[in-house]
Regions:
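His/Asp/Glu-rich metal-coordinating catalytic cores
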Residues: 71, 76, 84, 103, ...
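Catalytic-core segments of class I nucleotidyltransferases/pyrophosphorylases
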Residues: 124-198, 202-209
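Rossmann-like NAD(P)H-binding beta-loop-alpha module
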Residues: 105-136
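Conserved N-terminal catalytic core of the sugar/cofactor nucleotidyltransferase
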Residues: 5-91
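Structural beta-sheet core signal
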Residues: 23-24, 72-73, 100-103, 189
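A conserved hydrophobic position in a structured secondary element of the catalytic/binding core
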Residues: 28, 81, 119, 150-151, ...
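Short, high-confidence coil segments that cap the C-terminus of an alpha-helix
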Residues: 19, 68, 95-100, 185
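Conserved donor-nucleotide/metal-binding helix-loop-beta segment in metal-dependent transferases, i.e.
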Residues: 84-111
Length: 209
């Protein structure tokens, strides 16, 4: 993307945040990804079994053993992310009394994205992936952008409660939203002002867009 590996754009968006640790999960073609990241001050951790996004984050636990604070989780296939929006999200999270903040946005065509389920007051209850959603839930236009601010202590406790009881038989990272609510926490959300900036790239067609 713009003559650079896609993940470079994500890493560069994060760099000005001065994170204590930066960890990249690798799996498919891990050697190529690791080679592309040699110029950056970060560590790579392999997800040997492709068992879902929740499992991928769980694989990073050992790398964060000595860290205590806020974990920012992003997808490596969102090359249009801007530092300014990540800073805004971090500010929203730090000013809220919550262990978890998620980024949402609204799309006219939300196909393939997890839907944000809220109560009548607009409070976030859960994220339902498209393959697990009912027909009614699929009409929801507010989607999960796949970016999270999570307090580390809550994150790994919650991930141990995630199951593979879903249509894809995987550990969904999105399940930590419902787990937070179930444990009496309010989940904050940052509504991204530019939907196109958080869209992922899963094909050459999406890349061209």
């Amino acid at each position: 993307v713009f003559f650079e590996p896609m993940i470079h754009h994500v890493v560069k968006a994060v760099q000005p945040l001065d994170a204590e640790h930066s960890v990249v999960m690798v799996g498919h073609q891990k050697e190529a990804v690791e080679h592309a990241l040699t110029r950056f001050n970060l560590s790579c951790v392999e997800q040997k079994e492709q068992n879902g996004t929740g499992h991928a984050v769980l694989c990073a636990e050992a790398s964060l053993r000595d860290f205590h604070g806020t974990v920012l989780i992003l997808c490596g296939d969102s090359p249009l992310l801007l530092t300014e929006h990540l800073k805004e999200m971090l500010n929203v999270h730090s000013s809220a009394d919550t262990p978890l903040t998620i980024v949402t946005t609204s799309l006219e065509n939300p196909q393939n994205y997890g839907r944000i389920i809220t109560d009548n007051a607009g409070s976030v209850l859960e994220v339902v992936e498209e393959k697990d959603a009912t027909d009614e839930q699929r009409t929801i236009k507010e989607i999960n952008a796949g970016i999270y601010c999570v307090e580390k202590e809550f994150l790994f406790k919650a991930l141990r409660q995630v199951t593979t009881d879903n249509s894809q038989g995987e550990m969904y990272l999105t399940d930590i939203v419902a787990i937070a609510v179930r444990n009496g926490f309010r989940v904050e959300k940052y509504e991204h002002p530019v939907p196109d900036h958080v869209l992922g790239v899963n094909s050459r067609v999406e890349l061209s867009q």
